[in-house]
Amino acid sequence: ILIPVANPETIEDLVNLALVIKDAKQKNALVALNVINDNNSSEKKEQQGKRNLEKAAMIAAAADVPVTMVSRYDLNIASGIIHTIKEYEATDVVIGLHRKANIVDSFFGHLAESLLKGTHREVMIAKFLMPVNTLRRINIAVPPKAEYESGFSKWVEHFCRMGSILGCRVHFFANERTLMRLQQLVKKRHAGTPTEFSILEEWEDLLLLTGQVNYDHLLVVVSARRGSISYDTSFERLPAQLGKYFSNNSLIIIYPDQFGEPQEIVSFSDPRGHNESQHYEKVGKWFYKWLKKN
């Protein structure tokens, strides 16, 4: 699991998230990454980056988990993350958003866009309003056809493991067909995790979850890269909806694993992949606005 540590305020949450989703059998499972921009590096920034890496290693060491610390020069953060994923064969990336962050919207727009285009690995974008280990419930909104994505069973495993470790219930919301597949998978592989399943008739009904998600709950929204099997144009409205109705909740948006190398993933909706940038840019701009509000 790759953890970029650009923001010292999100490091603890990201490392703790990685600790509860990682496979206990995997050795050297965590890689902390500090990217130094080729164009505007300074000694001060390099020192801060080093401190960030050390902080990540210390938090994981408390749980007796080693961290590989990587500092690299690259053109930008997205490029640094993508290169490190390849070099260290990372299977997942967790990115943090601080609730009071004030980041330039084009920066996050570009980061999200470049990262999701540049890797087919699972990407989690997380914002925590409280420490990970104090969460009382995990609510997961799952879109139709999510069961056909190659990363389906992996993200289910991650959150069932998280629920088991934290001792909290994992509550899945999906349409009937997807819910049936979720129930089969959980029964077969994660029977020990306390789970609950509720019908979410239409993906548009996501807003009905406002009554289900308390302050000490984590809301996980399963999304998908543009052009993938479960991608839906309504995902473009997600940012605005989440920002408006779930701004007081800890939140993870997850983009599951996909088959093939990034450039091989052709779009079902549009083989030429038009409008992809537009979509990710919207997500990026929304994150910026949302973060400024909180």
Where are these regions (language model features)?
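Short conserved micro-motifs at the rims of enzyme active sites and ligand-binding pockets
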Residues: 14, 231-233, 263-265
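Terminal export/targeting leaders at protein ends
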Residues: 153, 238-240, 270-272
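Charged helix-capping and loop-helix junction motifs
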Residues: 108-110, 234-239
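C-terminal functional regions that serve as terminal interaction/effector modules
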Residues: 217-218, 225, 240-253
